[in-house]
């Protein structure tokens, strides 16, 4: 089962930029999300920041070239990540 963070908070948003905080998440989610975000046409930058492992001041940023809204790019990236994780889960359990 895939769980979602307990709290997702949009810290900043324009058409071309979105900065989102995912409470309780770490490099595990952010690295995968960053790699997938770069596969979406129109994404110029995808990055994350974790201030300190013991603090919950972390966030993810997507910046686009204007051909796609940053919010839409983030949603697409999250959907692609979910799909890849479900495919991996199916592959894993079928090969045990």
UniProtKB/Swiss-Prot annotation:
UniProt cross-references to Gene3D superfamilies, sorted A to Z: RNA polymerase, RBP11-like subunit
Enzymatic reactions: RNA(n) + a ribonucleoside 5'-triphosphate = RNA(n+1) + diphosphate
CDD domains on file: RNAP_L
Primary localisation category: cytoplasm
InterPro entries reported for this sequence: RBP11-like, RBP11-like_dimer, RNA_pol_Rpb11_13-16kDa_CS, Rpo11-like
UniProt-listed PANTHER family: DNA-DIRECTED RNA POLYMERASE I,II,III (PTHR13946), DNA-DIRECTED RNA POLYMERASES I AND III SUBUNIT RPAC2 (PTHR13946:SF28)
Family according to the record: Belongs to the archaeal Rpo11/eukaryotic RPB11/RPC19 RNA polymerase subunit family.
Record note on quaternary structure: Part of the RNA polymerase complex.
Official protein name in the record: DNA-directed RNA polymerase subunit Rpo11
Name of the gene encoding the protein in the UniProt record: rpo11
């Amino acid at each position: 089962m895939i769980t979602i963070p307990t709290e997702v908070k949009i810290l900043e948003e324009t058409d071309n930029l979105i900065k989102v905080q995912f409470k309780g998440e770490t490099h595990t989610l952010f690295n995968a999300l960053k790699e997938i975000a770069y596969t979406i046409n129109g994404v110029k930058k995808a990055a994350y920041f974790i201030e300190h492992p013991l603090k919950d001041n972390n966030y993810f940023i997507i910046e686009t070239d204007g051909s796609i809204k940053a919010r839409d790019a983030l949603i697409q990236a999250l959907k692609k990540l979910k799909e890849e994780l479900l495919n991996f889960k199916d592959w894993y359990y079928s090969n045990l």
